[in-house]
């Protein structure tokens, strides 16, 4: 019996010049997702996906590495300029934006889209250490 040849589908180059970088920086992790203007994901990365564990995930360096990785993957699809939407209170917000610029992407706009409740859910109880 002949062995079936399994071919993996190679990702095709998307040729997208402008995109949107969604940076979510929480107290525990940093995630960078780069999409086209419609919202379809081109590339993404996070501090945890790069192998940072525990409290190292929340550092600015981890956010910088995540942004760099996502930017390089997006630039393979022809991306040149991005608009940044930053969400969350984490330490890696500015570091991620700087890393996008250092990777060679032109940042056109930076917008803070952190959700702020108009007195919605009750916050978690205070930590006693």
From Swiss-Prot:
Record has rRNA-binding as a keyword: yes
MF GO annotations: rRNA binding; structural constituent of ribosome
GO biological process terms, semicolon-separated: translation
Transmembrane regions listed in the UniProt entry: none
Entry keyword Flavoprotein: no
Record keywords: Ribonucleoprotein, Ribosomal protein, RNA-binding, rRNA-binding
Matching InterPro entries: Ribosomal_uS11, Ribosomal_uS11_bac-type, Ribosomal_uS11_CS, Ribosomal_uS11_sf
One protein family per Pfam: Ribosomal_S11
Cellular-component GO terms for this entry: ribonucleoprotein complex; ribosome
Family: Belongs to the universal ribosomal protein uS11 family.
Role: Located on the platform of the 30S subunit, it bridges several disparate RNA helices of the 16S rRNA. Forms part of the Shine-Dalgarno cleft in the 70S ribosome.
HAMAP family registered for this protein in UniProt: Ribosomal_uS11 (MF_01310)
Summary of subunit composition and partner proteins: Part of the 30S ribosomal subunit. Interacts with proteins S7 and S18. Binds to IF-3.
Descriptive protein name: Small ribosomal subunit protein uS11
Organism: Desulfitobacterium hafniense (strain Y51)
Phylogenetic lineage: Bacteria, Bacillati, Bacillota, Clostridia, Eubacteriales
Gene that encodes the chain: rpsK
């Amino acid at each position: 019996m002949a062995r079936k040849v399994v071919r993996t589908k190679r990702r095709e180059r998307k040729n997208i010049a402008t995109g949107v970088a969604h940076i979510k920086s929480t107290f525990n992790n940093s995630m960078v997702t780069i999409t086209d203007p419609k919202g379809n994901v081109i590339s993404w990365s996070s501090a945890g996906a790069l192998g940072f564990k525990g409290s190292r995930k929340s550092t600015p360096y981890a956010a910088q590495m995540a942004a760099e990785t996502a930017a390089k993957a997006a630039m393979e699809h022809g991306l040149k300029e991005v608009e940044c939407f930053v969400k969350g209170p984490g330490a890696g917000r500015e570091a991620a934006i700087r890393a996008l610029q250092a990777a060679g992407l032109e940042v056109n706009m930076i917008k803070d889209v952190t959700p702020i409740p108009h007195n919605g859910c009750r916050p978690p109880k205070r930590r006693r250490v």
